Amino acid sequence: AGMTSTVFAQSDDFTTWTKFKVNYKIDPRFSLLSNLEFRTKDDVSRMDRLGLAIGGEYRAYSFLKLEAGYETHFRNLGDSEWKFRHRYNFGATASFQYQWLKIVLRERFQQTFDRGDSKARLRSRLKLAYAPEKGIVSPYFSIEIYQSLDDAPFWRADRMRYRPGVEIALAKRWALDVFYCYQYESPKGKHIAGVEI
């Protein structure tokens, strides 16, 4: 057992994710979304990827939002080799609140194209947050399951993310999100320190 735990500990990586978001509200129901993201890897010693995303969000009901978007990633493969990959996604997010507890359920389909290959995944996320009527600080915890839609058995988790964090409202439509995320994707895990603004 000791040997097994040592192997897993050695395979874990420590990384950072930093995301800058710009959202533009066209009308009460429709918003344009964009973000720029930087990720590191190998114990924060190297750049992992630079990502750019654009998309749209439509509030169908007070509790339901529909989304669609496109992303491109410039990824570091090592040995001075970088490559682009492309991804599109669409999904739905349902939000419910009872007193101070906010519950958010999101289902997202994504397909990634990488040098002629494609990979389709379904991402299911549950988020629980403390959301008081007054106050700007909202701690939360989320769990996200990635399921492969290609040749893997559907009910096998391809990747798992566990993410505690704190959102701080800086202005009416501007918030700071500071989080820790543990990602497990066989055979190794990732410890991620992140900031989104």
Give the location of each predicted region.
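Solvent-exposed loop/turn segments connecting transmembrane beta-strands
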Residues: 9-16, 40-49, 77-83, 113-120, ...
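Start-of-domain marker
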Residues: 10-67, 76
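Residue-level signature of outer-membrane beta-barrel architecture
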Residues: 24, 58, 94-96, 130-132, ...
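Repeated loop/turn-to-beta-strand initiation elements of outer-membrane beta-barrel proteins
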Residues: 29-34, 63-68, 98-103, 134-138, ...
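Transmembrane beta-strands of outer-membrane beta-barrel pores
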Residues: 36-42, 70-76, 96-100, 109-113, ...
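Detector for outer-membrane/organellar transmembrane beta-barrel domains
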Residues: 94, 100-147
